[in-house]
């Protein structure tokens, strides 16, 4: 807790003036006022690196770097600066969480992982890119950090659950936690993307895998969208058959408006797309099976895939009864789930419904490269889930949270009551307003 208190104290001071000026050089030298060496301890290191904005990369940049004479030295020089910046930016926001949430064992564990990873990366800040042993050790460190952060999502989720069960959550805290988790998990996705790219390109393992031979790290330059959708459907179907002894069929159609008659392919991370469609299939299957439980006949899940000049769109339609409009936003709330929460020790088993994180995390995966995920529901009939992905790799640019004055203000501003009238539950008695 001592480190947590120190980091929190530094965060409460707010971001320094002028830290986000346009054209601020990513040069950790005298032009930034101080250097990591002059900062003492973890709080000083976090403060220093949080002064820099993360550098978002486009899918094309990821692709070009990995496919044209991939250079481990170049990756080393970029990551040893960029990873501390991304870690430090989100660590500042962790420190702004409510004290009681910071004290939960799960959040303390997550915080310790981030501190340890930052310190390990900073060991390489003065190493030469010409030092072969330093490059080798750095790749090992990247893989170790990636493995350390494997359970960040369920561990942070458990911390929030512990906090809610012990202290409850008022509307302001709930709003701040929702805001934080969106940014924290988006940061985690981006950090893992960098770690995966380096470890897959230079880690030495998996390079010869036939199924991934044409991949650039975790990116498939010719990702066959229908194949990923079918894979997600089959795996969700196995779970559905296990739970309900039956499952709805899949009706899949594609329309390539850009190149008629050709299969739809896009530069993308297949694991991200798989995560999204797998979660949507689980939700659609569960809703369909439960809504039609007494009928014994289960309508198929329809999926339409279209590729235009700007967007790749995947629309999944079910006849699972839908949800009321007032509940749509709740479906993207991290603490909302219509199914019982699994026990922590079984959270890795990927049940058909669980923490309630499937939809919000899936939306973050879509938004990570400037896409989106939206729900449109017809209560009593069914739901359409629509995934939007950028069709061009040059438009697919990382969406990254940055710790600045706007973010700091969000955590430290009291959110006033809504500025729209709240309707009463009972009709107003207009007789009291009759004129004499």
Curated annotation (Swiss-Prot):
Description of activity control: Activity is enhanced by binding to the pyruvate dehydrogenase subunit DLAT. Inhibited by AZD7545; this compound interferes with DLAT binding and thereby inhibits kinase activity. Inhibited by dichloroacetate and radicicol. Activated under hypoxic conditions by phosphoglycerate kinase PGK1-mediated phosphorylation at Thr-338.
Residue stretches making up the Histidine kinase domain: 163-393
Residue(s) carrying Phosphothreonine: 338
Main location: mitochondrion
GO cellular component labels: mitochondrial matrix; mitochondrion; pyruvate dehydrogenase complex
Entry's EC annotation: 2.7.11.2
Uppermost EC category: transferase
InterPro entries the record matches: AK/P_DHK_N_sf (IPR036784), BCDHK/PDK_N (IPR018955), BCKD/PDK (IPR039028), HATPase_C_sf (IPR036890), His_kinase_dom (IPR005467)
Conditions for induction: Up-regulated via the HIF1A signaling pathway in response to hypoxia.
Gene Ontology terms: biological process: cell population proliferation; glucose metabolic process; hypoxia-inducible factor-1alpha signaling pathway; intrinsic apoptotic signaling pathway in response to oxidative stress; regulation of acetyl-CoA biosynthetic process from pyruvate; regulation of glucose metabolic process
Keyword NAD included in the entry's annotation: no
Positions of ATP binding: 279-286, 318, 337-338, 354-359
Gene3D superfamilies per UniProt: Alpha-ketoacid/pyruvate dehydrogenase kinase, N-terminal domain, Histidine kinase-like ATPase, C-terminal domain
Tree of life domain: Eukaryota
Reactions catalysed according to its record: L-seryl-[pyruvate dehydrogenase E1 alpha subunit] + ATP = O-phospho-L-seryl-[pyruvate dehydrogenase E1 alpha subunit] + ADP + H(+)
Residues with the N6-succinyllysine modification: 405
MF-aspect GO terms: ATP binding; protein kinase activity; pyruvate dehydrogenase (acetyl-transferring) kinase activity
Transit peptide, UniProt annotation: 1-28
Phosphotyrosine carried by residues: 136, 243-244
Function, as annotated: Kinase that plays a key role in regulation of glucose and fatty acid metabolism and homeostasis via phosphorylation of the pyruvate dehydrogenase subunits PDHA1 and PDHA2. This inhibits pyruvate dehydrogenase activity, and thereby regulates metabolite flux through the tricarboxylic acid cycle, down-regulates aerobic respiration and inhibits the formation of acetyl-coenzyme A from pyruvate. Plays an important role in cellular responses to hypoxia and is important for cell proliferation under hypoxia.
Family stated for the protein in its record: Belongs to the PDK/BCKDK protein kinase family.
Note: Exposure of cancer cells to severe hypoxia induces translocation of AKT to the mitochondrion, leading to AKT-mediated phosphorylation of PDK1 at Thr-346 which supports tumor cell survival and proliferation during hypoxia.
Protein name from the UniProt record: [Pyruvate dehydrogenase (acetyl-transferring)] kinase isozyme 1, mitochondrial
Naturally occurring in which organism (per UniProt): Homo sapiens
Species lineage: Eukaryota, Metazoa, Chordata, Craniata, Vertebrata
């Amino acid at each position: 807790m001592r480190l947590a208190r120190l980091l929190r104290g530094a965060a409460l001071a707010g971001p320094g003036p002028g830290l986000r000026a346009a054209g601020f050089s990513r040069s950790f030298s005298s032009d930034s006022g101080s250097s990591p060496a002059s900062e003492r301890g973890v709080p000083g290191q976090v403060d220093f690196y949080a002064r820099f904005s993360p550098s978002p990369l486009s899918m094309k940049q990821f692709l070009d770097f990995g496919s044209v004479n991939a250079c481990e030295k170049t990756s080393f020089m970029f990551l040893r600066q960029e990873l501390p910046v991304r870690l430090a930016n989100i660590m500042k926001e962790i420190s702004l969480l409510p004290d009681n949430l910071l004290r939960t064992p799960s959040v303390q564990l997550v915080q310790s992982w981030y501190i340890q990873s930052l310190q390990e990366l900073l060991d390489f800040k003065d190493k030469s890119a010409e030092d072969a042993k330093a490059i080798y050790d750095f790749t090992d460190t990247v893989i170790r950090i990636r493995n350390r952060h494997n359970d960040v999502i369920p561990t942070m989720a458990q911390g929030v659950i512990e906090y809610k069960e012990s202290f409850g959550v008022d509307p302001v805290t709930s709003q701040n936690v929702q805001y934080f988790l969106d940014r924290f998990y988006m940061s985690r996705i981006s950090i893992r993307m960098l770690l995966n790219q380096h470890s897959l390109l230079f880690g030495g393992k998996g390079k010869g895998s036939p199924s991934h031979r044409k991949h650039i790290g975790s990116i498939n330059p010719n990702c066959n969208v229908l194949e990923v959708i079918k894979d997600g459907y089959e795996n969700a179907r196995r779970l559905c058959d296990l739970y309900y002894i039956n499952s709805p069929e899949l009706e899949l159609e594609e329309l390539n408006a850009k190149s008629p008659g050709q299969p739809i392919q896009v530069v993308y991370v297949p694991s991200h797309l798989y995560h999204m469609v797998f979660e949507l299939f689980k939700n659609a299957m569960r809703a369909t099976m439960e809504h039609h439980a007494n009928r014994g006949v289960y309508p198929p899940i329809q999926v339409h895939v279209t590729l235009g000049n700007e967007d790749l769109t995947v629309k999944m339609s079910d006849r699972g009864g839908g949800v009321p409009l007032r509940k749509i936003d709740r479906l993207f709330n991290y603490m909302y789930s219509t199914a019982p929460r699994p026990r922590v020790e079984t959270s890795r088993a990927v049940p058909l419904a669980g923490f309630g994180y499937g939809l919000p995390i899936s939306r973050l995966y879509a938004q990570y490269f400037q896409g989106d995920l939206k729900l449109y529901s017809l209560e009593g009939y069914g739901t359409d889930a629509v995934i939007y992905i950028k069709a061009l790799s040059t438009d697919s640019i990382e969406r990254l949270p940055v710790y600045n004055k706007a973010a700091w203000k969000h955590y430290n501003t009291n959110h006033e009551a809504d500025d729209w009238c709240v309707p009463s539950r009972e009709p107003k008695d207009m007789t009291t307003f009759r004129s004499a």
